Amino acid sequence: MAAVIRIRAMAAGTRLRVLNCGLGTTIRSLCSQPVSVNERIENKRHAALLGGGQRRIDAQHKRGKLTARERISLLLDPGSFLESDMFVEHRCADFGMAAEKNKFPGDSVVTGRGRINGRLVYVFSQDFTVFGGSLSGAHAQKICKIMDQAITVGAPVIGLNDSGGARIQEGVESLAGYADIFLRNVTASGVIPQISLIMGPCAGGAVYSPALTDFTFMVKDTSYLFITGPEFVKSVTNEDVTQEQLGGAKTHTTVSGVAHRAFDNDVDALCNLREFLNFLPLSNQDPASIRECHDPSDRLVPELDTVVPLESSKAYNMLDIIHAVIDEREFFEIMPNYAKNIVIGFARMNGRTVGIVGNQPNVASGCLDINSSVKGARFVRFCDAFSIPLITFVDVPGFLPGTAQEYGGIIRHGAKLLYAFAEATVPKITVITRKAYGGAYDVMSSKHLLGDTNYAWPTAEIAVMGAKGAVEIIFKGHEDVEAAQAEYVEKFANPFPAAVRGFVDDIIQPSSTRARICCDLEVLASKKVHRPWRKHANVPL
């Protein structure tokens, strides 16, 4: 019996040693595997950080441009960037694209989230060092993913565009990727702020995403936006045109109105973008942040009492009024070099973000025309979508006459600005500084378009038209034209006819304008408006 027990014990010991031997081999195998995976992870990360390689990075720098990652690093708060999809690679196997040398971790775009002055934003930065920043299916997928996340959590999306366009090797998949992005641009419109910063070429299908975003900024001399390049234009129309002439920053900020501002270089653009974001809310559900204000809300501005010339035909600069009224003269003007007869931009009043709209008497006497109407309308609609109060300074003699305007559709385009002000439900405060003539008076956030508070300065002239034109109609053939003009001015070219009818709420001293506006904004902060249900409005596009 004892012998049997010893034999069984020996057998059990043998089996145990065998099991231990097998387990040891397994453990050693498992221990060595993570080392291999970790090495691969680190290698992939290193490759992703290099983008298209040092040679292409150097070429990017020689052009005066930062790399995709350098741009993100400068834009966001230090250490706040959390990258997503670093290991994503393109899926194209045609034209030799499956070769290992044509695979780059992250493909041609860097995506993720971070913070600007402590506030959450999502960002994508196209990497020109990888296939010229061209858009592949994987590239589009990465952008769409962060856009979906931004909509879900309610945070702005910033696109740093530097791309040669669609990746030709991927064919229709690349085009599908563009459409996926366009759809999200439309879905996000009015929900979260969308900002495009063009920092290199942006051609073909790539241009439509920036066009769908709320604001488009460009970098001088290095960024271009066009549907087709100069070579194609030459082949079709026989026009000789350079990239800069066709789609450079100057063209789009002064002629086409496609871009809202242009900056000197990448660093200047990114620093200004950080400043700009401070004015905006994170989403349509989030009020714009209120900054601590050291500029007294009841501050009087004596120089405003003499800023408007006594002669109604003499020009002055509306920016002088705007700068004097807002907090600490800090005004971020939008489209300053396009349609200069109207001024738009963001400022603060007692720490609150406001949208400013003002006619500019220095340019075309402040008349409204096609371009200024479109410029103003889009800005007003953005402010309304994101609950930013509107302050309007009015000095408008009417709509610009002439065949060029009529043939160009001034009636339809002018209606856009009228529509935008009428549709807006945010607090609306209007100050008539001098002329408010004809239909343009109605359009510029008048009481009839449900302006909340409408003020007139003593210099205000609210009438159907100017005295000279009115007299030629009313007193046609009258012997004493000067006396007739004086009579018209006495009766109509002053603020009293509108004031006695309640079309302006008060005639105020210009020096008290800041104090009155700040007080009104405090009261109107709780404004609520309920409109009839509709699927969407039919804007006169």
Curated annotation (Swiss-Prot):
Q: Where is the transit peptide?
A: 1-28
Q: What are the EC numbers?
A: 6.4.1.3
- Pfam families referenced in this protein's UniProt entry, alphabetically: Carboxyl_trans (PF01039)
PTM N6-succinyllysine: list the residues: K101, K250, K476, K491
Domain CoA carboxyltransferase N-terminal: where?
A: 34-292
- Gene Ontology MF, one: propionyl-CoA carboxylase activity
Modified-residue entries (N6-acetyllysine), positions: K101, K476, K491
Q: Residue positions of the PTM Phosphoserine?
A: S73
Region described as Carboxyltransferase = 34-535
Q: Which UniProt keywords apply?
A: Acetylation, ATP-binding, Ligase, Mitochondrion, Nucleotide-binding, Phosphoprotein, Transit peptide
Q: What role does this protein play? A: This is one of the 2 subunits of the biotin-dependent propionyl-CoA carboxylase (PCC), a mitochondrial enzyme involved in the catabolism of odd chain fatty acids, branched-chain amino acids isoleucine, threonine, methionine, and valine and other metabolites. Propionyl-CoA carboxylase catalyzes the carboxylation of propionyl-CoA/propanoyl-CoA to D-methylmalonyl-CoA/(S)-methylmalonyl-CoA.
Give the record's subunit note: The holoenzyme is a dodecamer composed of 6 PCCA/alpha subunits and 6 PCCB/beta subunits.
Protein family according to the UniProt entry: Belongs to the AccD/PCCB family.
Instruction: Name it.
Output: Propionyl-CoA carboxylase beta chain, mitochondrial
Q: Which source organism does the UniProt entry give?
A: Rattus norvegicus
Q: Gene name?
A: Pccb
